Amino acid sequence: MDQLIQLVEATQQRNDIPEVRPGDTVRIQLKVIEGEKERLQAFEGVVIGDKGMGASKTITVRKISHGVGVERIIPVNSPNIESVTVVRSGKARRAKLFYLRKRTGKAALKVKERKSASAEA
């Protein structure tokens, strides 16, 4: 039974999505269907948490829009995702960055930047 579940999940996994961790700033291009029209909508924000694994993995992305915090829970393996780009890698000491919800202004998006391996060499 377990092998059957793994087989089904393996077919639903997407390999074109980069590894995203809490603290990273990401830009996600989502397909939005309005009536008969289809367009792309960009959502850029800080990943404040991830949940699940395999085909059911989701990430929570938070951004500040016109002074109001907006969070969106996005299934990583959704067919509505056109692309995911890591704009900035953040260094977080927690798995869930819910403390960012209490912050306002620029402090709400402030996460230390992670040094990349290529920058050190």
From Swiss-Prot:
Biological process according to GO: translation
UniProt keyword terms in alphabetical order: Ribonucleoprotein, Ribosomal protein
GO cellular component: cytosolic large ribosomal subunit
InterPro entries: Ribosomal_bL19, Ribosomal_bL19_CS, Ribosomal_bL19_sf, Translation_prot_SH3-like_sf
Keyword Ribonucleoprotein: yes
Disulfide bonds: none
GO MF annotations in UniProt: structural constituent of ribosome
The organism's place on the tree of life at top rank: Bacteria
HAMAP family: Ribosomal_bL19
Family that this chain belongs to: Belongs to the bacterial ribosomal protein bL19 family.
Function: This protein is located at the 30S-50S ribosomal subunit interface and may play a role in the structure and function of the aminoacyl-tRNA binding site.
Protein name from the UniProt record: Large ribosomal subunit protein bL19
Organism: Chlorobaculum tepidum (strain ATCC 49652 / DSM 12025 / NBRC 103806 / TLS) (Chlorobium tepidum)
This protein's encoding gene: rplS
